[in-house]
Amino acid sequence: MSSTHTKTYLGNLDPSAPKETQHPCIYFSAVEQWERMKLYAAVLDFEPVAQEFGVERGFDPHIHDEAASSVDRYAQEREDLLHMPFVTIDPVGSRDLDQAVLIEEIDSGFRVHYAIADVAAFVEPGSELEKISLHRGQTIYLPDSPARLHPEELSEDAASLLEGQTRPAVVWSIDLDERGEVTATKVRRGLVKSRARLDYDQAQIDAENGRLHPSISLLPKVGQLRQESALRREAVNLSIPSQRVVKVPNDDAGEHYEIVIEPRPHIMDYNSEISLLTGMVAGEMMVKAGHGLLRTLAPATKESEATFRSEAQALGFEIAPEQPIGEFLQSVDPNTPKGMAIQREAQKLLRGSGYASVKNGDSEVHSGVGGYYAHVTAPLRRLIDRFATEHCLAIASGTDVPEWVTRVEEQVLDTMKYSSILASQVDNACLDLTEATVLKYWEGQNFNAVVVASEPEKNSARLFVYKPPVLAKCIGAPEQGTNQEVTLVTANLKKREVLFAWPAD
């Protein structure tokens, strides 16, 4: 097999390499999406992907004008909560801040206060802002720049829970006992002010050095309790590290790209547990009331679970037949190449998620969290959160759900279905393009890989390549679970396709 480069054997990725040897990268602003992997690749151009899938990244001028002039529709209904020292925790540089948190210790356990951006306060029913959000459904996060659900005047300013700014919010207060189980819930509209804008990396360092911000000093403890709670132990909760693409100079004065795994701080998972907790409380609330909007996911089939266990063993993990997959995943370090690979494989167990209206008590659970669940914590980037939240507020106050909610609920569900499919397609296309771009420089080279699955009858296999950390197709069917040397046959940017061959040249 011909190659313009000297043949090089690429071995295991060394995650312990010192940071000073890693190359800088321009980050794009992203927010936590616990069901998806984050890809930081601002050094690449994803506009062709956006055009192919019809993703609109901008807004017409009149939409910007409407967003800039919008005011709080519920100003007279708010409880003054400005005395509460909320803080936000997000990726570095983020300005679309949906959530702020404060955790207190009480006699019976803990009280979790969670302030959520009140987007409904700024979106007038029947307005152009409502129409565009009903069309888009959710923010689509391309790695170079996002296609936002709302204009920046809202998502990064008036509705965002920015540090030091008085903001309208929907505030949840959830009491937990000493085991982390829910004992009481309160939700209302309020005015809040974030005291600090924290990022995950610095918060993790602070936690490890005993100087975590007082407002979240209990977050690690509460997060761990929630992970260990009865419903959560057997749930399939993914902890996928992000990946970033860096530009690396060649010896011949050219350059190529590499993928680096971004270590996932524990504080990120603990923070995600607060969002999951709130969504589970909201789901239970709506099911008991007999109305609302749920996030649903049917349990994985026995066949898909068996396939996952086989792939885990092929990657070198030990998983006993009786061990719940959720419990196994909690034991895996996602910041290693194999750990990231098995977390990505576990995504297949969460296929088929959707949204449903609660009707006549006939409600589906979300097997990914282990109970009823609703999306209510990310209204800046997801349409349905705005509407599900109104159900919860109505239930809590004993009032009717607003007509502007019930009038368009079916459209909201349809838009979420369509936009979720679109977001998944764009995610996959961006990842495929990234992997093809990174590997293009190494066409014809040999790589070390482990065989995740093998189909001799089709003369094909699925591989996990150690460096760069990619899952890819292979011509040839080496034995599952074995380490093999394979040759990169194709890295096609136009087709966004990567293909290896075995045996290696």
Task: Annotate each predicted stretch with a short phrase.
Residues 487-489:
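Residue-level recognition of conserved beta-strand edge/terminus positions
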